[in-house]
Amino acid sequence: MAKLTKRMRVIREKVDGTKSYDINEAVALLKELATAKFVESVDVAVNLGIDPRKSDQNVRGATVLPHGTGRDVRVAVFTQGANAEAAKAAGAELVGMDDLAEKIKAGEMNFDVVIASPDAMRVVGMLGQILGPRGLMPNPKTGTVTPNVAEAVKNAKAGQVRYRNDKNGIIHTTIGKVDFTPVQLKENLEALVSALKKAKPAVAKGIFVKKISISTTMGAGVAVDQATLETTV
């Protein structure tokens, strides 16, 4: 049996895996146990009451967190004309059409989000094998294919998170950094859960949000008592 590190022993002593914690207590635990030499991200896993094998029960979308994610987001935009100028004015690092596609084909991938206006999808469509596996392919459901590219750029820069359930019906995303205040992390989590509830598929039956766990990059998951969250449906 592998020997537990000192860090893991401390986590096991502090975190009760059978308990759901008040959100404030859960955040305090994460902060206490975040001892890495860098500012860890705070990640969330939300178990949904869906059958992920059925396409009409899959959950996918995006929402802007009120306090952002703490990350500097680099944005690439496929568009032209007045939209190109608007995207640049909104803060996009890369804007273009065929010229931008050629850069990506050549391996230049120094961006975190790709946005496209509908008229640019003929160009973006040819990059599916490059962007798709990296989770960067623009999609109307996440607001990254839109005629209003400037607004999409602003949302991405403001801390928009995109979510999509995995094959087990779990949503994984980030809600900030461990140096955020407890209130900021709580409000970001509440915004995400509210967005997920609004995205509930009509055919999903029973309890929709089954379990919420938060963790830091190097830490263990801490289950959150949903009753301590203020969310809207």
Swiss-Prot record:
Purpose of the protein: Binds directly to 23S rRNA. The L1 stalk is quite mobile in the ribosome, and is involved in E site tRNA release. Protein L1 is also a translational repressor protein, it controls the translation of the L11 operon by binding to its mRNA.
Molecular function GO terms recorded: rRNA binding; structural constituent of ribosome; tRNA binding
HAMAP family assigned: Ribosomal_uL1_B
Source organism of the structure: Shewanella baltica (strain OS185)
Similarity comment: Belongs to the universal ribosomal protein uL1 family.
Keyword RNA-binding: yes
Quaternary context: Part of the 50S ribosomal subunit.
Annotated InterPro entries: Ribosom_uL1_bac-type (IPR005878), Ribosomal_uL1 (IPR002143), Ribosomal_uL1-like (IPR023674), Ribosomal_uL1/biogenesis (IPR028364), Ribosomal_uL1_3-a/b-sand (IPR016095), Ribosomal_uL1_CS (IPR023673)
Protein name: Large ribosomal subunit protein uL1
Keyword Signal: no
Gene Ontology CC annotations of this record: cytosolic large ribosomal subunit
Domain of life the protein comes from: Bacteria
One GO biological process term: translation
Record keywords, A-Z: Repressor, Ribonucleoprotein, Ribosomal protein, RNA-binding, rRNA-binding, Translation regulation, tRNA-binding
